[in-house]
Design a protein with these regions (language model features):
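Nucleotide-sugar donor-binding/catalytic module of glycosyltransferases
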Residues: 1-218
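Short, surface-exposed amphipathic charged segments that create phosphate/polyanion-binding patches used
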Residues: 91, 258-259
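Catalytic core of nucleotide-sugar-dependent glycosyltransferases
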Residues: 205, 217-242
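A transmembrane-helix-recognition feature enriched in membrane-embedded lipid enzymes
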Residues: 233-257
Length: 262
């Protein structure tokens, strides 16, 4: 296990602090090809009240060398085995000292260097979740994806977690369910909405989301996890199934048979 906390004199304390402290987290594992651009995107933010945490799952491919290269700009980083991305995200929430937390994982980027300043400088929020729009990065190019109004939550996911900021206190009280490998974020936001959690669309593009990696590595798991949830909770599972149904229409028939099998 490696656990690094930056000395106080290695963190820029010269600028006056803005109103709300934001924690940005990057979770990674063997991400040597993606991690540097994500780190650069985070440390280039002009907002001055940010802590940056990296939680690595015990990489062996050179990822740690890149993290060490930027260690003076990282508030804290740890490298140790974990039980998956959502276990690592829960771990980072326990480390966080900010009021809101954003997960910008390896391969994903902020829309530009002024995202945090545009949202938080000179402003203060009380909502449980702030969210915005996303640029989807496919292998062949980019596609804007506007956030939806929160009343669409019963039928679709209005935003992705890279384009959201969640109160740290809320995530500590209701951590991601690590029994899900791919859809714990969707389950978290849906359950928060159902329990009366408050959301605010900040009407800005926040993240550039690496969809190529998602589609190739995650969507199939997401689809079948959603089907399993549907068997246990038809309302929640049906909602999650619709999130990925459009991408896997050929699987629809067999998945419906699985969900409704006696």
């Amino acid at each position: 296990m490696i656990n690094f906390v930056a000395p106080i004199n290695d963190i820029d304390m010269t600028q006056p602090k803005a109103s709300q402290k934001i924690t940005v987290v990057t979770v990674c594992y063997n991400a040597v090809k993606e991690i540097e651009k994500t780190i650069q995107s985070v440390i280039s933010q002009t907002y001055d009240n940010v802590e940056y945490i990296i939680v690595d799952g015990g990489s062996t491919d050179g990822t740690l060398d890149i993290i060490r290269k930027y260690s003076s700009r990282i508030t804290r980083w740890v490298s140790e085995p974990d039980k998956g991305i959502f276990d690592a995200m829960n771990k980072s929430a326990r480390m966080a000292t900010g009021e809101y937390i954003n997960f910008m994982n390896a391969g994903d980027l902020f829309f530009d260097e002024k995202v945090l300043s545009d949202i938080f400088a000179g402003r203060s929020y009380d909502e449980d979740v702030l969210y915005g729009s996303t640029i989807l990065h496919y292998k062949g190019g980019y596609k804007p994806h506007r956030s939806a109004t929160i009343d669409r939550m019963p039928v679709c996911m209005p935003f992705c977690h890279q384009s959201s900021f969640t109160k740290v206190s809320v995530l500590r009280e209701h951590p991601f369910d690590t029994t899900f490998l791919s859809i714990a974020d969707c389950v978290f936001f849906r359950q928060l909405y159902n329990s009366g959690g408050t959301f605010r669309d900040v009407k800005k593009y926040i993240a550039i989301y690496d969809m190529y990696g998602y589609v190739s590595n995650t969507s199939l798991k997401c689809y079948f996890e959603s089907c399993l949830v549907h068997r246990q909770n038809p309302t929640l599972g049906g909602y999650l199934r619709r999130l990925v149904d459009i991408n896997f229409r050929p699987l629809r028939y067999c998945s419906l048979r699985f969900m409704y099998a006696e």
